[in-house]
């Protein structure tokens, strides 16, 4: 068995260790409390700043306050307006002679001591001054003989019949290198009887040619 002195020493050491542990625990608790207090103070400071911002937002700016005061001091719009004498509409007064700008075109400005230059006519004035020429076609002005008129009366139905026969044809037929278009021009613009007679003969030949082609198909 160990002596009583050793037991006492061991007990003292244990008590010292427990005391040190207790002191460490106390220090940690104090530091923890301090940190908690700092956090609380930070939160309170943030809340104070937020409340200050809200107060500033709720408070109108100085300019708005001045506008509110001015609108309150101004007379109400419901008050009847003062009667004003009716004023008639006055048109714009004509410009004074001295204020008119002088033309500075080269063809209107005159040198001192020389007569003013004549104004050059514009295209619009030329168009208005020119006499209009009557548009007359060759058909309206010509004077056909009775024989020429009779030939034309026979050519036109033949040309119309050729047109009806050529509607379903893919190729354009010709007689003596004359097509339906050239025969129509000859009938409209030729005045001599022999020319119209040849046109009638060619038109009848072309009509017979179209008829023969359509019968073959």
Curated annotation (Swiss-Prot):
Positions of region (RS-repeat): 166-186
Region (Necessary for nuclear subcellular location): 160-187
Compositional bias ranges of the Acidic residues kind: 24-68
InterPro entries: Adeno_L4-33K/L4-22K (IPR021304)
Domain of life, per lineage: Viruses
Segments of skewed composition (Basic and acidic residues): 123-136
Function, as annotated: Promotes alternative splicing of late transcripts by promoting splicing at weak 3' splice sites. Required for the temporal activation of major late pre-mRNA splicing at late times of infection. Induces the splicing and expression of the late capsid vertex protein. Probably functions as the small terminase that is part of the molecular motor that translocates genomic DNA in empty capsid during DNA packaging. This motor is located at a unique vertex and comprises at least the IVa2 ATPase, the small terminase 33K and probably a portal. Forms a ring-like structure of about 17 nm in which genomic DNA is translocated into the capsid. Stimulates IVa2 ATPase activity in the presence of the viral genome. Once the DNA is packaged, the terminase detaches: the 33K protein is present in the empty particles, but not in the mature virions.
Subunit structure: Homooligomer. Interacts with DBP; this interaction occurs at a unique vertex during genome packaging. Interacts with IVa2; this interaction occurs at a unique vertex during genome packaging and seems to potentiate IVa2 and 33K oligomerization.
Protein name (Swiss-Prot/TrEMBL): Protein 33K
The species this protein was found in: Human adenovirus F serotype 41
């Amino acid at each position: 068995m160990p002596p009583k002195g050793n037991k006492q020493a061991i007990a003292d050491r244990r008590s010292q260790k427990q005391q040190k542990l207790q002191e460490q625990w106390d220090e940690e608790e104090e530091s923890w409390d301090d940190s908690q207090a700092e956090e609380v103070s930070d939160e309170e400071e943030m809340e104070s700043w937020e409340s200050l911002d809200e107060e500033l937002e709720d408070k109108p700016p100085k300019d708005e306050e001045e506008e509110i005061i001015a609108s309150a001091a101004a007379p109400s719009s419901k008050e009847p307006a003062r009667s004003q004498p009716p004023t008639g509409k006055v048109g714009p007064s004509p410009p004074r002679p001295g204020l008119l700008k002088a033309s500075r075109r080269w063809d209107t400005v005159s040198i001192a001591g020389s007569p003013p230059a004549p104004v050059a006519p514009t295209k619009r004035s030329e168009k208005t001054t020119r006499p209009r020429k009557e548009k007359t076609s060759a058909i309206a002005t010509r004077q056909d003989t009775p024989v020429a008129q009779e030939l034309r009366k026979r050519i036109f139905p033949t040309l119309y019949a050729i047109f009806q026969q050529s509607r379903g044809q893919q190729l354009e037929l010709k007689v003596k290198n004359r097509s339906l278009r050239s025969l129509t021009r000859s009938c409209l613009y030729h005045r001599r009887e022999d020319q119209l007679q040849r046109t009638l003969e060619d038109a009848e030949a072309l009509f017979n040619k179209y008829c023969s082609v359509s019968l073959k198909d």
